[in-house]
């Protein structure tokens, strides 16, 4: 569903993690992630399916990251790892075991939504 507006909802906590999530539909958009952007809005995120490690080189701002496991039949995914406020330029996650993708988020998004490891999240159309 690349290009379609999405939101990331924490079904365990009943919270919205990010209301405007873009899906990286190509290798290049996953490779670039949020590099080169001057900032990220508080309600924004980037879903990168298939990505299990990230780096912060060339990033201009810190981010939160939620690493998600495989999609269940109902479309939900378990949170397998979290990184809060990864600093620009120096943060790195080599591998998040069990991850099948990662969502890059504005710093503080995970705390605001009370998201924890083991929670179930769903990417769904933003119009819901």
Where on the chain are the PLM-derived regions?
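Compact, glycine-rich, soluble single-domain proteins
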Residues: 1-128
